[in-house]
Amino acid sequence: MFDKNYLLPADALALIVNALPGGRPKTEKLPIEESYRRIIAVDVVSLEDLPGFSRSTVDGYAVHAEDTFGAKETSPAYLGLKYEVLMGQAPDFEVARGFAAKIPTGGMLPPGSDAVIMLEHVQPVSEDLIEILRAVAPGDNVIQLGEDIRKGETVLTAGKSLRAQDIGALAGIGVTSIEVFKKPVVSFISTGDEIVSPDSPLRPGQVRDINSFTLAGLAMNHGSIMIKKGIIRDNYEEIRKAIEESLQDSDMVLISGGTSAGLKDMTAAIINDMGMPGVLFHGVSLKPGKPMIGGVAQGKPVLGLPGHPAATVVCFDLFIKPILNRLRGLGRQPYIIRSVKATMAKNIASAAGREDHIRVSVEEKEGKLLAFPVLGKSGLITTLVKADGIVIIPQSKLGLDAGEEVTVRLF
């Protein structure tokens, strides 16, 4: 049963974001080949035109377009052939009226010409005469000087995540290095007397650490650096020391375990000990992920995550990812969620008063995408392995019906 006083995830997130200090993240300068998916820290203004000259988009002949007007296969035009444009060289000639110059794809348009006619529409008559079988208009088959980027134009704006094509544009205007925001550093602390490392033999009552490896992959995929602080016993002073150290060498602190009510619940108390404002919420109207703790200490977000793997992944998506966006330099800009539209293949129930995040697998059948619920408790890692994404059931709904269209947030 969910307490109606619990915050919805979006409202809980807003408490953390609003409590964080303002200011720009630190920056660094990188070669463009190392800047993929990094966040630009400054606007990039081109110091030159791209292209730096008018050039042909096809193999053909540079001409005065007017000399071809009316030309067709049954009534061709005839032009003298006197010059040839060479790749990588500026033409040292001018195309006079009534003449053409042979030009390759990418070749610089010679002075006097204003269009290029394709090879397929030209018939050689002799070494110095060609037959034009189709007319062209001024600018046909030509990329003009500065048509792609003009000198003084803002090519990329600060706060943008660099894609491969953006890096190509930088290279095209001669930019070889770029100022970007530094990757945020996230410390992760695993707590629990029952947690052991993956290479340890299991004794009765013990489980291997799953969450630190899952979160490390998620953090890396989202432009940050994860520092795993190891496994800390359920001891107040040990956990406090680990959090204190993490606040000194990282931008965000994540603690796994110690969030459910019980004798060994120390996370909230320790966060409050770290300084104002401390814990901002303890528990959210969410499944899985109800025991989530959110706070800010020493100007840095400190989050207590549920120990169940599925809950950890959901909480990363709802809380950690948006906060990382801010720390990465995206500020309050919305991030793009990879999603697909699908049709629910089966009914799925949900309790009233909470936001339910259902793991689903997606299959294509008869030309449409179907979303199949992946059933299982949030402590089962295989429910994530078998799933392709999440479908959100809003707090106001009691479930989803088979045949209902849904949005699947892809992992």
Task: Outline where the language-model segments fall.
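Flexible glycine/proline-rich
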Residues: A10, G23, E28-E33, V42, ...
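Short, hydrophobic/aliphatic alpha-helical segments
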Residues: S35-D49, A90-K102, G294-G295, G299-P301
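Solvent-exposed alpha-helices and their adjacent loops that cap or buttress functional pockets
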Residues: S54-S56, A71-T74, D92-A96, L109-P111, ...
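Short, glycine/charged-enriched hinge/interface segments at domain edges or termini
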Residues: F2-K4, P9, A62-R233, L370, ...
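Conserved active-site and cofactor/substrate-binding residues in soluble primary-metabolism enzymes
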Residues: K4-D11, T27-L30, E34, E48, ...
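Intrinsically disordered, low-complexity, positively charged segments
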Residues: N5-G70
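Helix-rich terminal scaffold detector
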Residues: M1-A10, T176-L305, P309-C315
